[in-house]
Amino acid sequence: MIETDRYDPRLDRDALKEIFEDFIENKSYFISTWKEFEKELNKRVLDLQYRNSMIIAKEEGVIVGWGTYTLIKDYLGNNRALIHQVLTKREDSYRKGIEEQIIRELKLYIKRTLNLDKVFIICQDSDSALRNLVMKLGAKKSKNYWYENDI
């Protein structure tokens, strides 16, 4: 049975590193290194709001997933919560409900703590498993389009 909990940097770092490395290796559209990820992780650990929002999923005491969000304040003063893709190992991906459980927990945290009634979820068009989960959770393609440009 999968249980969710808060990320503890003292206890969970090594297990998260293993999951991160597997995730980066198998999700070709994400480019990062453990060093870059750990640097961001260390910043988030110092911010109570972000520290409490880092959710892990455990199966029989072993960490099998990790998820978080980023709060963005736009130039009009609107807060937007952006849920990132949940980190899992390839063999666990979408088979055990890890992603769904973590996303549901994050949505609940965002609603209760930040008092927001809308979240945005990052989903690659090429990732049909995540897109199916996002639709199962009732999310629809946003009218807010983001474009990317190399500079």
Question: What are these language model-derived features?
Answer:
Residues V86-K89, C123:
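Hydrophobic adenine-recognition pocket in adenosine-nucleotide-binding enzymes
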Residues V119-R131:
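Conserved beta-strand-loop-alpha-helix junction that forms the acyl-donor binding cleft
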Residues M1-I2:
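Extreme N-terminal starter segment of soluble prokaryotic enzymes
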Residues I122-C123, M135-I151:
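Conserved catalytic-core motifs of GNAT/GCN5-like acyltransferases
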Residues I110-L114:
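Hydrophobic pocket-lining residues that define ligand/cofactor binding sites across diverse proteins
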Residues L116-D117, K140:
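Short acidic/polar active-site loop segments enriched in Thr and Asp
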Residues R6-R10, E21-N78, H84:
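Acetyl-CoA-dependent GNAT
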Residues T88, Y94-L108, N132, K136:
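Conserved acetyl-CoA-binding loop-helix of GNAT-fold acetyltransferases
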